[in-house]
């Protein structure tokens, strides 16, 4: 990292540098745009351009000072058409009070006042100048300053402040937005001092796949066994007014019915019983004719 020209109070901590390296914010692409050369540290033998994270930190602080200078936070619009940055801009907006546009940017948001989503922000922040090119183009028409997360191959046309970082990785994008939000809150005085850690973890800014989250926790239903319900309850046949099961098996569908069936099955089916034909025989001395009702006389 190159020597910093910032005051000592703004120097990054060792934890900040470790987080930037762990999130691979320093790894750019194999292509290099001419305007991004000042932020280049070196090129690896495999052709990957390495970004100077010292420059990344300086630009994060510069962008935070610009954001904190705007009186109304709602006049700041954060935009991300890239899926990896949509969760980050929503969290940034909730923590700083900015206006978020996560997903497709509707053409005319900044230039066509007839549209319902028309906005007049004083500053916009985009995740990727390439995917958010429409927003940058419209901002240039109405003289709106632009802050952008730029990779080594990102176009910098109409970008006023470029934060050099890896804008294609989910962790890199989330970390830069998290650092930017933390610095804004520090400059506004929301955080007491720079020695106090922010209680919001950086994981909240990372992209999460909805399908992966749904498949992560799959709970299989099962019927409680005798060990879960209790041997005493089965032996007693769940005698009581209610069929509630007290124990680990409570709340499992079909537990009481299964236990009662097991108790009934314990009884012997070989018990001696009476003849069903004998019980239905007519009493001796009584004729069937006598049992017929007398005919009514007309």
From Swiss-Prot:
GO CC annotations on file: cytosolic small ribosomal subunit
Complexes and interactors: Component of the small ribosomal subunit. Mature ribosomes consist of a small (40S) and a large (60S) subunit. The 40S subunit contains about 33 different proteins and 1 molecule of RNA (18S). The 60S subunit contains about 49 different proteins and 3 molecules of RNA (25S, 5.8S and 5S). Interacts with rps21.
Domain of life: Eukaryota
Disulfide bonds: none
Keywords: Cytoplasm, Ribonucleoprotein, Ribosomal protein
Database matches in InterPro entries: Ribosomal_uS2 (IPR001865), Ribosomal_uS2_C (IPR032281), Ribosomal_uS2_CS (IPR018130), Ribosomal_uS2_euk (IPR027498), Ribosomal_uS2_euk/arc (IPR005707), Ribosomal_uS2_flav_dom_sf (IPR023591)
Main location: cytoplasm
GO biological process, one term: ribosomal small subunit assembly
Cytoplasm among keywords: yes
Family matches, as Pfam families: 40S_SA_C, Ribosomal_S2
Organism: Aspergillus niger (strain ATCC MYA-4892 / CBS 513.88 / FGSC A1513)
Subcellular localization, as worded in the UniProt entry: Cytoplasm
Protein's recorded name: Small ribosomal subunit protein uS2
Family statement: Belongs to the universal ribosomal protein uS2 family.
Region (Disordered): 272-298
One GO MF term attached to the UniProt entry: structural constituent of ribosome
Function: Required for the assembly and/or stability of the 40S ribosomal subunit. Required for the processing of the 20S rRNA-precursor to mature 18S rRNA in a late step of the maturation of 40S ribosomal subunits.
């Amino acid at each position: 990292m190159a020597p910093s020209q910032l005051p000592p109070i703004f120097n990054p901590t060792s934890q900040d540098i470790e987080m930037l390296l762990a999130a691979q914010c320093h790894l750019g692409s194999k292509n290099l745009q001419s305007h991004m050369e000042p932020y280049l540290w070196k090129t690896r033998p495999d052709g990957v351009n390495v970004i100077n994270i010292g420059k990344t930190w300086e630009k994060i602080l510069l962008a935070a000072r610009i954001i904190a200078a705007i009186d109304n936070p709602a006049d700041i619009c954060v935009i991300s058409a890239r899926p990896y940055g949509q969760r980050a801009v929503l969290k940034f907006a909730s923590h700083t009070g900015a206006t978020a546009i996560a997903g497709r940017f509707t053409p005319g948001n900044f230039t066509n006042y007839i549209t319902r989503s028309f906005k007049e922000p004083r500053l916009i922040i985009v995740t990727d100048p390439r995917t958010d090119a429409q927003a940058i183009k419209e901002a240039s028409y109405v003289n709106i300053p632009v802050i952008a997360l730029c990779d080594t191959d990102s176009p910098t046309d109409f970008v006023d402040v470029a934060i050099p970082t890896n804008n294609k990785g989910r962790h890199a994008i989330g970390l830069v937005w998290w650092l930017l939000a933390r610095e804004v809150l520090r400059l506004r005085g929301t955080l007491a001092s720079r020695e106090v850690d922010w209680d919001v973890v950086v994981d909240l800014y990372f992209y999460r796949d909805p399908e992966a989250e749904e498949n992560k926790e799959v709970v299989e239903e099962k019927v409680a066994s005798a060990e879960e319900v209790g041997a005493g309850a089965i032996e007693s046949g769940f005698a009581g007014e209610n069929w509630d099961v007290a124990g680990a098996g409570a709340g499992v569908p079909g537990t009481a019915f299964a236990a009662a069936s097991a108790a009934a099955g314990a009884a012997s089916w070989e018990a001696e019983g009476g003849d069903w034909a004998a019980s239905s025989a007519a009493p001796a001395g009584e004729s069937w004719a006598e049992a017929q009702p007398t005919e009514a006389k007309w």
